[in-house]
Regions:
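Active-site-proximal beta-strands of protease catalytic cores
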Residues: 19, 23, 54-58, 120-133, ...
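Flexible, gly/ser-rich surface segments that form the specificity/activation loops bordering the active-site cleft
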Residues: 117-119, 123-157, 192-195, 212-215
Length: 322
């Protein structure tokens, strides 16, 4: 039956080969297995193993470029690693461990997680939360998806949130797996409220896959510098607005500010691409390289109504956002 597939994954601990701990370090080479988390450590999940390196997805709010870290595998072995790339928009990072620094034992005990899709996840589906959902290493929970209808707003786009019935821990982190053990989400605390009870939610993996591929290849994330929402057909009709992507705010010193894009503008085209939703804008921008010169066609309010304005912007490398 449907639930038995989750039981098989839990009983066989298939996911254990995917999960690691990343801990900040100075010059120490002491080998010890972490059992609880502090501010300088986080869990990670192996997303790729090549002949040269092991690539691990982690959270950038703990793992910083230039910092010194070690990866702890499930057998307790600790190996130096480096941050290959990070995305300050979402707080995600990709960490690299050289195969040459690992033992045969480590190599036999690990496996890369299979990538799933969050687009196919619907309310009522079971999900496995692995990594650190309870605030300590190797904790695991099985829950049910309550909603996929909410999004979290980030710079240059939005990401679908997978919400569950599982109680959230303030120090919890980790990943969502589906019934086949495939990665479908990354636990986040975005949107947590200042109350006693919050529920575990995750960023849908499908909305961050393109940027993860960039980070895994050592590339930076293109940066425009706006926060946006979607003007749907209904909103446009009820508020007498043009349809498109509404600019809620412009980040200080961003490429968007340099090209004089303003709060309240409604973007309709990027380059030769029509954009009607915040997700479409995010997808279109992710297809460009840093340094790309783009034309932006938008509607801007004036005393005589909305007028078409054409702007030109040069995408830059993503800066560390505050």
């Amino acid at each position: 039956c449907y639930f038995s597939r989750y039981f098989t994954i839990l009983n066989n601990k298939i996911f254990v080969k995917n999960i690691v701990t990343i801990r900040g370090t100075g010059e120490s080479t002491i080998k010890e297995e972490p059992s609880s988390f502090d501010a300088d450590e986080t869990c990670g999940i192996i997303i790729s193993i090549t002949e040269k390196e092991i690539l691990i997805l982690a959270q950038q709010n703990t793992v910083k470029v230039g910092g010194q870290y070690r990866v702890y595998f499930q057998l307790g072995d600790a190996v130096p690693c480096e941050v290959k790339g990070y995305d300050s928009k979402t707080g995600l990072a990709v960490v690299s461990v050289l195969i040459s620094q690992t033992t045969n034992g480590i190599q036999k005990s690990i496996a890369a997680v299979q990538m799933g899709t969050s687009k196919a996840i619907s309310r009522g589906k079971y999900v496995i939360a692995v990594g650190n959902p309870l605030g300590n290493m190797s904790s695991v929970q099985v829950g049910i998806i309550n909603s996929t209808s909410f999004v979290s707003s980030y710079v240059d786009g939005v990401i679908t949130l997978l919400s569950t019935n599982l109680i959230s821990q303030s120090k919890g982190s980790g990943f969502f797996l589906d019934e086949d053990g495939r990665l479908i989400g990354i636990i986040t605390h975005d949107g947590d409220e200042a109350k006693e009870t919050n529920f575990i939610k995750a960023l849908g993996i499908s909305d961050v896959t393109t940027n993860l591929e960039r980070l895994a290849n050592g590339k930076n994330i293109p940066y425009f510098g706006i926060r946006v929402s979607t003007v749907t057909e209904k909103i446009a009709r009820e508020n007498e607005l043009p349809e498109g992507v509404y600019v809620e705010s412009v980040i200080l010193d961003s490429p968007a500010m340099a090209t004089a894009i303003q709060k309240g503008d409604i973007i309709q085209e990027v380059g030769k691409n029509s954009v009607k939703t915040a997700k479409q804008l995010q997808q279109v921008l992710s297809n460009y390289e840093i340094g790309a010169n783009l034309s932006i066609s938008l509607k801007r309010f004036s005393p005589t109504g909305y007028k078409t304005v054409l702007c030109y912007v040069t995408l830059t490398s993503l800066m560390e956002l505050k």
